[in-house]
Amino acid sequence: MNTLQRTQSNAKRQHADPGAWINVIAGNQEQPAWNVAAIMVKIRTSYELLKSGHASDADFDRVGAALNIGLIRAESIDPLCEQTMLRGIDAMYVCAGLHERHGTYGFTGPGIVAMNDAVDLYEEILTKSNGRQMTIAQEAAHVRLLKLINGVVQ
């Protein structure tokens, strides 16, 4: 090995991330309770605002994103979990329809029951999933949403 090759080889080694193992371990641990609580406070607050008819579009988007991410995780967990999330998403479609017709968000009676179950399930999924799993689910939900927007059918 000549001097130039040695110099290039050393340069490659210096660019490696010496703390990469920390990221791998942290990404494969369950969510800390404080993180789950912080996320769920925002989601539950937005959900309550949707129920009361005082929600903004951002509140609707927050709850919808949580359910879509939860659906991705639920698909890999259990068909019953998947059906629970799908019923919650259907309730969100009805909620959006009410907003288009009346100008305020809201749910029907069965929609409230479905949403209560879906939000509770999302909290359980968030608690039991590690950060890496939730990041993968978030990316998959984003890709699925882009396909839906662009009219690509799965």
Residues covered by each model-derived region:
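Secondary-structure edge/capping motif, primarily at the C-terminal ends of alpha-helices
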Residues: 47-53, 70-77, 99, 122-129, ...
